[in-house]
Amino acid sequence: MIKIAVTGGIGSGKSYISHLLENMHIPVYNADNEAKRLTVSDAGIRGELIALLGEEVYKDGLLNKPLLASYLFSDPAHVLQINSIIHPRVRKDFTVWVERQEKCEIVGMESAILYEAGFQDTVDAVIMVYAPVELRIQRAMYRDGASEEQVRARIAAQMDDEEKRRRADFTVVNDGVQLLIPQLNRIVEQLKTEKFR
């Protein structure tokens, strides 16, 4: 089984590329969504967050996002602390998920923070979804109802696209001009070669 990751900045089209891969019968684990799920459902994460932030970190069984956000943004060390609680469990959950996909030749993981979380070590190849920054801003503003300033701040907080591109094995250009399916078909064919087995 070949494990791939799909990553890219906000508004690059990661989820759309993941959707196209799923249409090609390649199941994709969405690490960002699963991290949110595990933050509520995993007893270990819940216990550590309660020990760190108190019972009020969960309200009516749901994560108190404003409280967590205020903690995260008050000190950069807090981000590392929270990530050290959540990311190992996401990694373990991905491993269990992969085992359940035993009949698949290729499986994927979608993660906006693949490199920051160290998830690149769990896959055989990385696909970086690249789009021009102005297009990404427009997409994110439309999708999230965010202001341009908010989107630019989120872009600035993420790893630079060129660094992600340099580290990735493949790049899909999602600029609204280049066709996506032929790019993905070429990548999937390359993945099936000996290099990735």
Segments from the language model and where they lie:
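ATP-dependent NMP and nucleoside kinases share a basic, alpha-helical "lid"
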Residues: 92-101, 106-142
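P-loop (Walker A) phosphate-binding loop of NTP-binding proteins
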Residues: 9, 21
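Walker A/P-loop
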Residues: 15
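ATP-dependent small-molecule kinase phosphotransfer cores
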Residues: 33-105
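ATP-binding Walker
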Residues: 12
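Hydrophobic anchor at the beta1->P-loop junction of P-loop NTPases
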Residues: 6
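Small-molecule kinase domains that catalyze NTP-dependent phosphoryl transfer to phosphate-bearing small molecules
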Residues: 121-122, 133, 142, 146-190
